[in-house]
Amino acid sequence: RSNSNLAILLGLCLLTVCGGSTNRQFHHELEAEHYLRAGEYDKVLRVGEKSLEASRTLTAYRAVALSRLGKMGDRLFAYPQYYRSDGLFFETDSLHTLRYTNDSIYYLLGARPYTGEDRMVFLRNICYKGTGKYTSLDYYLSALLLEKKLDSFAQAVPDFYLPEDTLPRYYREALVM
């Protein structure tokens, strides 16, 4: 009898090990979320940094971490960007249960959009009206680059930066193009 109990226990242990979650993207999201909640923004950026796979959630976590570090214009494009400007925000899909939501990002930006307001219009408005925090400018300029709106980007930069200011790396590169 004890041998059969031991065999059942061993079988359950093997089942747990073999049948455990092997979704690498999900594990990256959980790890990044953990570091984000702990305020360890550099560690968020190291999660899955060598992988070419990046979920929208992980991409949004990286954007939040870069924004908190003030490095969005210098390092955003060092990571895969598969979702255009949508990757700066979390999915609003109710199937995804996240501790971080777009409300977290709106708090970071210092404003929230009106119901149904286009994100690009929202970001532009809070930058030009001055209702957002300083982080909103990086979100706006990065969104323009992610949407490949180089003309709008080139028009916006002089509105927010003085000629003698040192621009972040990717902003300088975009202006050269």
What are these regions (language model features)?
Residues 158-163:
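Active/binding-pocket-proximal capping segment
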Residues 167-168:
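Substrate-recognition/cap regions that form aromatic- and gly/pro-loop-enriched pockets
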Residues 2-23:
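Internal/C-terminal transmembrane anchor helices
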